[in-house]
Amino acid sequence: MGIRRCKPTSAGRRFVTYHDFSEITKDEPYKPLTTCIKKRKGRNNQGRITSWLKGGGNRKLYRIIDFKRNKHGIPAKIESIQYDPNRSARIALLKYMDGEYRYILAPDGLKVGDTIMSGSGIDIKVGNALPLKEIPLGTMIHNIELFPNGGGKLVRSAGTAAQLMAKEGKYAHVKLPSGEVRLINVNCFATIGQVSNLEHENVIIGKAGRTRHMGRRPSVRGVAMNPIDHPLGGGEGKSSGGRAACTPWGKPEGVKTRKNKRTDKFIIKRRK
């Protein structure tokens, strides 16, 4: 795992960097665990744009990932570490003792040939999935469930890890990468270790076309729009907009947008 630099043969390649993919052991995905997903381009079922700056991008197969880790008590051997175009982390192909194959998020340090398990009463080892009540305090974890049997929802991107801080009754205190401390049911499962591909944050995209290949469209400044499109739009020449920075709907910049009030009681400390 490392970063590869390019010779500055053009302006677009002068600062661009790439992964060297040295940890990848197989190029082709396991076909039974792939499927096609239609791109929505940020549109809803009425064709209206609900998420800006999306569209285009390279074609890719979706790899079906096992976020639940619900095959308990059966050892699985790591067959290969693979690239997944749908996420920043690497994925690992498991072969269970009963012959079933599954993909999981590859933790950092996992190698081909290693054996991992999930369930209660197993060893505290990188790649193993256990309920929070059985994990020692201070352990680095990822792929954390929010509710029992709900599948991993938190801490899934490259290089991230959460820390188990305390246990109190039926809840555990988990410190997330954002700095937020959250109460999570002790029966929820989490995977031991840190997510793979630690160098992901150091990759320099380097040129606009590479961002378009990822399916991201250009972002237009509000002051460059017309008055009908944005509160900062219009004016003669290059104007500043005449007011404080705001959203296209007039809300001041920096206003909290979190809507889920029923789970506020589970947040002990807000993110930084």
Curated annotation (Swiss-Prot):
InterPro entries: NA-bd_OB-fold, Rib_uL2_dom2, Ribosomal_uL2, Ribosomal_uL2_bac/org-type, Ribosomal_uL2_C, Ribosomal_uL2_CS, Ribosomal_uL2_dom3, Ribosomal_uL2_RNA-bd_dom. Keywords: Ribonucleoprotein, Ribosomal protein, RNA-binding, rRNA-binding. One of its GO terms (molecular function) is rRNA binding. One of its GO terms (biological process) is cytoplasmic translation. The keyword Ribosomal protein applies. Residues 263-272 have a biased composition (Basic and acidic residues). Residues 222-272 are annotated as: Disordered. GO terms for cellular component: large ribosomal subunit. The keyword Ribonucleoprotein applies. Part of the 50S ribosomal subunit. Forms a bridge to the 30S subunit in the 70S ribosome. Belongs to the universal ribosomal protein uL2 family. One of the primary rRNA binding proteins. Required for association of the 30S and 50S subunits to form the 70S ribosome, for tRNA binding and peptide bond formation. It has been suggested to have peptidyltransferase activity; this is somewhat controversial. Makes several contacts with the 16S rRNA in the 70S ribosome. This is Large ribosomal subunit protein uL2. The lineage of its organism: Bacteria, Pseudomonadati, Nitrospirota, Thermodesulfovibrionia, Thermodesulfovibrionales. The gene is rplB.
